[in-house]
Protein backbone atom coordinates (compact mmCIF):
# COMPACT_ATOMS: atom_id res chain seq x y z
CA UNK A 1 0.00 0.00 0.00
CA UNK A 2 1.40 3.40 -1.03
CA UNK A 3 2.35 5.72 1.81
CA UNK A 4 -0.07 8.59 2.41
CA UNK A 5 1.47 12.01 1.81
CA UNK A 6 0.52 15.49 2.98
CA UNK A 7 2.03 18.88 2.19
CA UNK A 8 1.83 21.71 4.71
CA UNK A 9 2.33 25.36 3.87
CA UNK A 10 2.15 28.65 5.75
CA UNK A 11 4.66 31.15 7.05
CA UNK A 12 5.91 34.69 7.39
CA UNK A 13 5.04 34.89 11.10
CA UNK A 14 5.00 32.38 13.97
CA UNK A 15 1.20 32.48 13.93
CA UNK A 16 1.19 31.03 10.42
CA UNK A 17 3.29 28.05 11.54
CA UNK A 18 2.08 27.15 15.05
CA UNK A 19 -0.93 25.04 14.06
CA UNK A 20 1.13 23.18 11.46
CA UNK A 21 3.64 22.27 14.18
CA UNK A 22 0.80 20.87 16.30
CA UNK A 23 -0.56 18.74 13.45
CA UNK A 24 2.67 17.46 11.88
CA UNK A 25 3.66 15.02 14.68
CA UNK A 26 0.16 13.55 14.64
CA UNK A 27 0.37 12.84 10.90
CA UNK A 28 3.87 11.40 11.33
CA UNK A 29 2.68 9.13 14.14
CA UNK A 30 -0.08 7.81 11.86
CA UNK A 31 2.44 6.93 9.15
CA UNK A 32 2.06 9.86 6.78
CA UNK A 33 4.98 11.21 4.77
CA UNK A 34 5.08 14.93 5.54
CA UNK A 35 6.35 17.70 3.27
CA UNK A 36 6.42 21.47 3.85
CA UNK A 37 6.44 24.22 1.22
CA UNK A 38 7.74 27.57 2.42
CA UNK A 39 10.49 30.16 2.16
CA UNK A 40 13.95 28.97 3.20
CA UNK A 41 14.58 32.46 4.60
CA UNK A 42 11.28 32.53 6.51
CA UNK A 43 10.31 31.72 10.08
CA UNK A 44 8.64 28.53 8.82
CA UNK A 45 11.99 27.01 7.77
CA UNK A 46 13.57 28.01 11.08
CA UNK A 47 10.69 26.50 13.07
CA UNK A 48 10.68 23.24 11.10
CA UNK A 49 14.46 22.91 11.56
CA UNK A 50 14.17 23.51 15.30
CA UNK A 51 11.31 21.03 15.66
CA UNK A 52 13.50 18.14 14.47
CA UNK A 53 10.43 16.54 12.89
CA UNK A 54 10.95 14.15 9.98
CA UNK A 55 9.70 16.68 7.41
CA UNK A 56 10.93 17.28 3.86
CA UNK A 57 11.13 21.06 3.32
CA UNK A 58 10.75 22.59 -0.15
CA UNK A 59 11.63 26.25 -0.66
CA UNK A 60 9.81 28.39 -3.24
CA UNK A 61 9.84 32.01 -4.38
CA UNK A 62 7.31 34.23 -2.66
CA UNK A 63 6.08 37.77 -3.20
CA UNK A 64 4.30 40.09 -0.81
CA UNK A 65 0.66 40.74 -1.66
CA UNK A 66 -0.28 44.40 -1.19
CA UNK A 67 -3.66 46.12 -1.07
CA UNK A 68 -2.18 49.36 -2.41
CA UNK A 69 -0.43 50.37 -5.63
CA UNK A 70 3.32 49.84 -5.67
CA UNK A 71 5.81 49.20 -8.43
CA UNK A 72 7.00 46.27 -6.31
CA UNK A 73 3.66 44.59 -7.07
CA UNK A 74 4.80 44.06 -10.67
CA UNK A 75 7.91 42.14 -9.57
CA UNK A 76 5.98 40.25 -6.91
CA UNK A 77 3.39 39.06 -9.44
CA UNK A 78 6.23 37.31 -11.26
CA UNK A 79 7.54 35.90 -7.95
CA UNK A 80 4.11 34.48 -7.12
CA UNK A 81 3.82 33.05 -10.63
CA UNK A 82 7.23 31.44 -10.33
CA UNK A 83 6.22 30.11 -6.92
CA UNK A 84 3.14 28.48 -8.50
CA UNK A 85 5.32 26.77 -11.12
CA UNK A 86 7.73 25.59 -8.43
CA UNK A 87 4.82 24.28 -6.34
CA UNK A 88 3.38 22.45 -9.35
CA UNK A 89 6.73 20.75 -9.93
CA UNK A 90 6.98 19.74 -6.26
CA UNK A 91 3.45 18.35 -6.16
CA UNK A 92 3.78 16.40 -9.40
CA UNK A 93 6.88 14.78 -7.91
CA UNK A 94 5.49 14.20 -4.40
CA UNK A 95 1.90 13.35 -5.42
CA UNK A 96 0.29 14.23 -2.07
CA UNK A 97 -3.25 13.28 -1.09
CA UNK A 98 -3.86 16.69 0.47
CA UNK A 99 -2.50 20.21 1.09
CA UNK A 100 -3.02 21.97 4.43
CA UNK A 101 -2.42 25.73 4.52
CA UNK A 102 -2.15 28.02 7.54
CA UNK A 103 -1.91 31.19 5.47
CA UNK A 104 0.66 33.89 4.91
CA UNK A 105 1.94 35.12 1.54
CA UNK A 106 4.06 32.02 0.94
CA UNK A 107 0.95 29.81 1.03
CA UNK A 108 -0.72 31.29 -2.05
CA UNK A 109 1.38 29.54 -4.76
CA UNK A 110 0.98 26.03 -3.23
CA UNK A 111 -2.77 26.54 -2.78
CA UNK A 112 -3.19 27.60 -6.42
CA UNK A 113 -0.98 24.73 -7.63
CA UNK A 114 -2.87 22.13 -5.58
CA UNK A 115 -6.18 23.34 -6.95
CA UNK A 116 -4.88 23.11 -10.52
CA UNK A 117 -3.85 19.50 -9.84
CA UNK A 118 -7.21 18.73 -8.17
CA UNK A 119 -5.53 18.03 -4.84
CA UNK A 120 -7.91 18.77 -1.92
CA UNK A 121 -6.95 22.04 -0.21
CA UNK A 122 -7.73 22.60 3.48
CA UNK A 123 -7.07 26.08 4.88
CA UNK A 124 -7.20 27.50 8.40
CA UNK A 125 -8.08 31.12 9.23
CA UNK A 126 -7.44 32.36 12.77
CA UNK A 127 -8.85 35.88 12.63
CA UNK A 128 -12.33 37.35 12.52
CA UNK A 129 -11.68 38.70 9.02
CA UNK A 130 -9.52 36.96 6.44
CA UNK A 131 -6.12 38.26 5.49
CA UNK A 132 -5.43 38.89 1.80
CA UNK A 133 -3.59 35.58 1.35
CA UNK A 134 -6.48 33.59 2.78
CA UNK A 135 -9.05 35.61 0.84
CA UNK A 136 -7.27 34.37 -2.29
CA UNK A 137 -6.88 30.87 -0.83
CA UNK A 138 -10.61 30.67 -0.10
CA UNK A 139 -11.36 30.75 -3.84
CA UNK A 140 -9.24 27.60 -4.33
CA UNK A 141 -10.02 25.83 -1.05
CA UNK A 142 -11.96 22.64 -0.53
CA UNK A 143 -12.71 23.65 3.07
CA UNK A 144 -11.62 26.60 5.21
CA UNK A 145 -11.67 26.07 8.96
CA UNK A 146 -12.27 29.23 10.99
CA UNK A 147 -11.68 30.26 14.58
CA UNK A 148 -14.53 32.78 14.45
CA UNK A 149 -18.00 32.26 13.00
CA UNK A 150 -18.23 33.59 9.44
CA UNK A 151 -21.01 34.83 7.18
CA UNK A 152 -23.40 32.22 5.74
CA UNK A 153 -22.34 33.46 2.30
CA UNK A 154 -18.93 31.84 2.83
CA UNK A 155 -20.19 28.34 2.12
CA UNK A 156 -16.77 26.65 2.21
CA UNK A 157 -16.06 27.70 5.79
CA UNK A 158 -16.41 25.39 8.79
CA UNK A 159 -16.36 27.02 12.23
CA UNK A 160 -14.18 24.97 14.60
CA UNK A 161 -13.23 27.50 17.27
CA UNK A 162 -9.68 28.00 18.50
CA UNK A 163 -7.22 25.12 18.37
CA UNK A 164 -4.78 25.31 21.24
CA UNK A 165 -2.36 22.94 22.93
CA UNK A 166 -2.67 24.67 26.30
CA UNK A 167 -3.54 22.44 29.22
CA UNK A 168 -6.35 24.10 31.12
CA UNK A 169 -5.04 22.78 34.44
CA UNK A 170 -2.53 24.99 36.17
CA UNK A 171 0.95 23.50 36.20
CA UNK A 172 3.21 23.86 39.19
CA UNK A 173 6.41 25.84 38.79
CA UNK A 174 7.52 25.44 42.42
CA UNK A 175 10.29 23.00 41.48
CA UNK A 176 11.59 25.07 38.55
CA UNK A 177 15.09 26.33 39.40
CA UNK A 178 14.90 29.30 37.01
CA UNK A 179 11.54 30.36 38.42
CA UNK A 180 12.96 30.15 41.95
CA UNK A 181 15.81 32.44 40.89
CA UNK A 182 13.40 34.94 39.32
CA UNK A 183 11.24 34.94 42.45
CA UNK A 184 14.26 35.93 44.53
CA UNK A 185 14.26 39.24 42.63
CA UNK A 186 10.48 39.70 42.78
CA UNK A 187 8.53 41.32 45.60
CA UNK A 188 5.94 38.78 46.87
CA UNK A 189 3.68 41.65 47.96
CA UNK A 190 3.27 42.86 44.36
CA UNK A 191 1.19 41.47 41.50
CA UNK A 192 3.15 40.12 38.53
CA UNK A 193 2.61 41.30 34.95
CA UNK A 194 3.69 39.39 31.85
CA UNK A 195 4.16 41.32 28.60
CA UNK A 196 4.14 39.23 25.40
CA UNK A 197 4.24 40.98 22.05
CA UNK A 198 4.59 38.25 19.45
CA UNK A 199 6.99 38.26 16.52
CA UNK A 200 5.82 41.65 15.22
CA UNK A 201 4.38 43.51 18.20
CA UNK A 202 6.92 43.44 21.05
CA UNK A 203 8.83 46.67 20.35
CA UNK A 204 6.21 49.02 21.80
CA UNK A 205 6.01 46.93 24.99
CA UNK A 206 9.81 46.84 25.25
CA UNK A 207 10.07 50.62 24.93
CA UNK A 208 7.18 51.20 27.34
CA UNK A 209 8.84 49.07 30.03
CA UNK A 210 12.20 50.79 29.50
CA UNK A 211 10.61 54.26 29.68
CA UNK A 212 8.31 53.60 32.66
CA UNK A 213 10.31 53.16 35.89
CA UNK A 214 7.15 53.41 38.05
CA UNK A 215 6.00 50.09 36.55
CA UNK A 216 8.50 48.08 38.61
CA UNK A 217 7.71 50.12 41.72
CA UNK A 218 4.13 48.84 41.67
CA UNK A 219 4.45 45.46 39.92
CA UNK A 220 6.80 42.61 39.22
CA UNK A 221 7.33 42.61 35.45
CA UNK A 222 8.15 39.79 33.03
CA UNK A 223 8.95 40.93 29.49
CA UNK A 224 9.26 38.39 26.65
CA UNK A 225 10.92 40.85 24.32
CA UNK A 226 12.24 39.10 21.21
CA UNK A 227 15.42 41.17 21.72
CA UNK A 228 18.45 39.43 23.22
CA UNK A 229 20.15 42.76 24.03
CA UNK A 230 17.44 43.47 26.63
CA UNK A 231 17.95 40.23 28.58
CA UNK A 232 18.12 41.13 32.25
CA UNK A 233 17.13 39.97 35.72
CA UNK A 234 16.99 42.78 38.26
CA UNK A 235 14.77 44.02 41.07
CA UNK A 236 11.12 43.30 40.11
CA UNK A 237 12.06 42.85 36.43
CA UNK A 238 12.82 39.84 34.25
CA UNK A 239 13.44 40.40 30.54
CA UNK A 240 14.07 37.50 28.17
CA UNK A 241 14.14 37.40 24.38
CA UNK A 242 12.60 34.00 23.76
CA UNK A 243 11.26 31.07 25.80
CA UNK A 244 10.08 27.53 25.09
CA UNK A 245 10.01 25.30 28.20
CA UNK A 246 9.84 28.41 30.39
CA UNK A 247 6.73 29.79 28.67
CA UNK A 248 4.17 27.99 30.83
CA UNK A 249 6.00 28.48 34.15
CA UNK A 250 6.25 32.21 33.43
CA UNK A 251 2.58 32.27 32.49
CA UNK A 252 1.72 30.55 35.78
CA UNK A 253 3.77 33.15 37.66
CA UNK A 254 1.83 36.05 36.14
CA UNK A 255 -1.34 37.52 37.63
CA UNK A 256 -2.17 39.56 34.52
CA UNK A 257 -0.91 39.21 30.95
CA UNK A 258 -0.56 42.20 28.62
CA UNK A 259 -0.60 40.99 25.04
CA UNK A 260 -1.12 42.02 21.44
CA UNK A 261 -4.30 40.92 19.67
CA UNK A 262 -3.07 37.97 17.62
CA UNK A 263 -5.67 35.22 17.76
CA UNK A 264 -3.25 32.39 18.64
CA UNK A 265 -2.08 34.10 21.82
CA UNK A 266 -5.41 35.44 23.04
CA UNK A 267 -7.12 32.08 22.58
CA UNK A 268 -4.30 30.41 24.53
CA UNK A 269 -5.01 32.87 27.32
CA UNK A 270 -8.72 32.09 27.04
CA UNK A 271 -7.97 28.36 27.33
CA UNK A 272 -5.96 29.04 30.50
CA UNK A 273 -8.63 31.43 31.85
CA UNK A 274 -5.79 33.91 32.36
CA UNK A 275 -6.62 37.54 33.10
CA UNK A 276 -5.36 39.59 30.17
CA UNK A 277 -5.33 43.02 28.61
CA UNK A 278 -5.17 43.29 24.82
CA UNK A 279 -3.19 46.13 23.25
CA UNK A 280 -3.94 45.51 19.57
CA UNK A 281 -1.77 46.56 16.68
CA UNK A 282 -3.52 49.46 14.94
CA UNK A 283 -4.42 49.77 11.27
CA UNK A 284 -1.18 51.63 10.58
CA UNK A 285 0.78 48.49 11.53
CA UNK A 286 -1.66 45.78 10.41
CA UNK A 287 -4.84 45.22 8.40
CA UNK A 288 -6.95 45.84 11.51
CA UNK A 289 -7.52 42.18 12.42
CA UNK A 290 -6.16 42.65 15.94
CA UNK A 291 -8.59 45.50 16.57
CA UNK A 292 -11.44 43.17 15.58
CA UNK A 293 -10.10 40.34 17.75
CA UNK A 294 -9.73 42.66 20.75
CA UNK A 295 -13.24 44.06 20.34
CA UNK A 296 -14.65 40.52 20.12
CA UNK A 297 -12.88 39.42 23.32
CA UNK A 298 -13.98 42.53 25.19
CA UNK A 299 -17.59 42.06 24.03
CA UNK A 300 -17.54 38.42 25.17
CA UNK A 301 -16.24 39.48 28.59
CA UNK A 302 -12.96 37.57 28.29
CA UNK A 303 -10.60 40.56 28.48
CA UNK A 304 -10.22 44.31 28.43
CA UNK A 305 -8.48 46.22 25.68
CA UNK A 306 -6.25 49.29 25.80
CA UNK A 307 -5.23 51.20 22.71
CA UNK A 308 -1.55 51.66 21.97
CA UNK A 309 -2.08 55.44 22.11
CA UNK A 310 -3.30 55.11 25.70
CA UNK A 311 -0.53 52.79 26.82
CA UNK A 312 0.82 54.74 29.78
CA UNK A 313 1.23 53.78 33.41
CA UNK A 314 -1.90 55.54 34.70
CA UNK A 315 -4.22 53.98 32.11
CA UNK A 316 -2.66 50.53 32.35
CA UNK A 317 -2.75 50.59 36.15
CA UNK A 318 -6.45 51.50 36.07
CA UNK A 319 -7.33 48.61 33.74
CA UNK A 320 -5.23 46.13 35.76
CA UNK A 321 -6.97 47.12 38.99
CA UNK A 322 -10.39 46.75 37.35
CA UNK A 323 -9.49 43.29 36.03
CA UNK A 324 -8.27 42.14 39.44
CA UNK A 325 -11.33 43.53 41.24
CA UNK A 326 -13.59 41.63 38.82
CA UNK A 327 -11.35 38.59 38.48
CA UNK A 328 -14.10 36.06 39.21
CA UNK A 329 -16.42 37.53 36.57
CA UNK A 330 -13.76 37.40 33.83
CA UNK A 331 -12.55 33.93 34.76
CA UNK A 332 -16.11 32.56 34.87
CA UNK A 333 -16.69 33.91 31.35
CA UNK A 334 -13.49 32.28 30.11
CA UNK A 335 -13.99 28.91 31.78
CA UNK A 336 -17.56 28.66 30.45
CA UNK A 337 -16.47 29.42 26.87
CA UNK A 338 -17.07 26.73 24.26
CA UNK A 339 -14.65 28.26 21.73
CA UNK A 340 -11.67 25.97 22.39
CA UNK A 341 -10.85 22.79 20.48
CA UNK A 342 -7.93 20.50 21.31
CA UNK A 343 -5.37 19.63 18.61
CA UNK A 344 -6.48 15.99 18.80
CA UNK A 345 -10.11 16.94 18.20
CA UNK A 346 -9.18 19.07 15.21
CA UNK A 347 -6.81 16.42 13.85
CA UNK A 348 -9.59 13.82 13.95
CA UNK A 349 -11.99 16.22 12.20
CA UNK A 350 -9.37 17.02 9.56
CA UNK A 351 -8.68 13.32 8.95
CA UNK A 352 -12.39 12.66 8.49
CA UNK A 353 -12.67 15.50 5.97
CA UNK A 354 -9.51 14.40 4.13
CA UNK A 355 -10.88 10.87 3.83
CA UNK A 356 -14.20 12.22 2.56
CA UNK A 357 -12.65 14.53 -0.05
CA UNK A 358 -9.79 12.26 -1.14
CA UNK A 359 -11.77 9.16 -2.10
CA UNK A 360 -10.45 7.68 -5.31
CA UNK A 361 -7.25 9.73 -5.25
Curated annotation (Swiss-Prot):
InterPro entries: GlcNAc_MurG, Glyco_trans_28_C, GlycoTrans_28_N. GO terms for biological process: carbohydrate metabolic process; cell division; cell wall organization; lipid glycosylation; peptidoglycan biosynthetic process; regulation of cell shape. UDP-N-acetyl-alpha-D-glucosamine binds at residues 199, 290. Pfam families: Glyco_tran_28_C (PF04101), Glyco_transf_28 (PF03033). It is a peripheral membrane protein. Keywords: Cell cycle, Cell division, Cell membrane, Cell shape, Cell wall biogenesis/degradation, Glycosyltransferase, Membrane, Peptidoglycan synthesis, Transferase. Cell wall formation. Catalyzes the transfer of a GlcNAc subunit on undecaprenyl-pyrophosphoryl-MurNAc-pentapeptide (lipid intermediate I) to form undecaprenyl-pyrophosphoryl-MurNAc-(pentapeptide)GlcNAc (lipid intermediate II). This is UDP-N-acetylglucosamine--N-acetylmuramyl-(pentapeptide) pyrophosphoryl-undecaprenol N-acetylglucosamine transferase. It comes from Streptococcus mutans serotype c (strain ATCC 700610 / UA159).
Amino acid sequence: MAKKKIIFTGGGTVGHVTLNLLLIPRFLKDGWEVHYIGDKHGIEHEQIEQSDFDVIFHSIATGKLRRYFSLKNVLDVFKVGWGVLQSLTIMVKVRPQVLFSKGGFVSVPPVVAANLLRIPVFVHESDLSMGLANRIAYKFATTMYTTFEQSDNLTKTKHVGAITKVNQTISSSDDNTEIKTIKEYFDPRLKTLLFIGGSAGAKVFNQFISDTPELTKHYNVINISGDKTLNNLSQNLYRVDYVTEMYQPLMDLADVVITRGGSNTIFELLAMAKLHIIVPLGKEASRGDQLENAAYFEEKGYAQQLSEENLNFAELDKVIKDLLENQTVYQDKMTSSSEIKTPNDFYNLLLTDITSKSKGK
